[in-house]
C-alpha cells in the first residue's frame, strides 16, 4: 500500500502515532478474511486498536477491485466497527475499466472517505478529499493548514477540476492510458524472455526482466 511504503511515514506522523497494520491479499487487493484476522488478532491494551481500512483503487499493482469486492470489504468494516478509506489516485482508470458510475465503487459500496487524484489524468497538482460521511470532515480545513496542504493560490489548483469532470476529459484520458497499457502488455507478452507479473487491469504494467 502506498501509505505504508511510499509516504516516508507521513500518515503515522500526522495521525499522532497511529500504527499502520498490514493485511495480506493477492495482486495488490486486500483479502476480507485477512482484514478480519488483523482486526481481531488481539484486543489487549498493548496492541493497536484498528479504526479504518484503507484500500487503493486501482491498486499499486495495476489491478482493479470490482464493485462487489468493495461492497464485501465495506460490509465487513461495518461489522467490525471500522471506517473505509479509498486511495483513488487512479480512480478514473478503475472507472474506465469497470464502466460503472463512481458511486458504485465508493459511497454505495461502503467507502467513507475518498482521496480522489487527478494528476494521473492530466492535472498538474492537487487531489480532492471527498467525505461521504460529513462528520469525518470536522475541522479538516484546520488539519490541511497544519499539514501544509493549503496553497496560497488554491483557486488555481482547483480550477481544472470542473473542466476535467464535467467535460469527460478525465475518463477519456483514463481510457487512453488503459489502452496504451494494454498495448504495452500485449507487446511484452510476445517476448518470451519477459514476464508480466500481475493482471493488467488499469494503466500499470509490472514486468520481470532477465
Please give the residue ranges for each predicted region:
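Conserved PLP-enzyme active-site core in the AAT-like
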Residues: 1-210
